[in-house]
Amino acid sequence: MKIIYIHGATASERSFAFIQQSIRSAEPIYLNYNKATTAEQNLIDMRKVLDTVQEPFAIIAHSLGGVYATYIQNEYQTTGVVSLATPFGGSELATWGSIFNPHYQLFKDISPSSSFIRNSKKIDIQCPWIQMVTTVGDVPWINGTNDGIVTRSSMMCRRDVEYMEIDRNHYEIVLSQRVVDIIKNIVYK
């Protein structure tokens, strides 16, 4: 089975090295994107890659990658999605960041009031989806319980996914053996 990996905003495909080495799917496909480009253009570019995939696949997505996954999961033969600390409700940190850099495209796209986030919440999830909610790493300048980057309420604002709490912070989750074991269980059912 093919596995599509979609990284988080400040990461790259290398952030999945531990997971990918542990799972060893036949052919990993990485959907990379440019945080300086609009989310809409990134989706166009991702679809060009996915249009070449001729068989069903699972998606593993970290953080912002999970928001992208909401847009593509129902357009292809997606067997399931595992998202790690995805900010379905947007990022309060991006709202703060936009005060200091109002022209940074990533902040515009991931802000809770952005059309990218608002529209993603209107999309029905049509495949099995598990969201790993990170529970460690709280920082005081983000309002509400958070993992150092994303608030718990943002990670848990959808009603059409299954939630599982993981005692890791936003970055450690991609290095967790427990997460790998859960992913294997889901991907190879």
Task: Map each language-model feature to its residues.
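Serine-dependent carboxylesterase/thioesterase catalytic core
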Residues: I3-H7, R14, S22-Q126
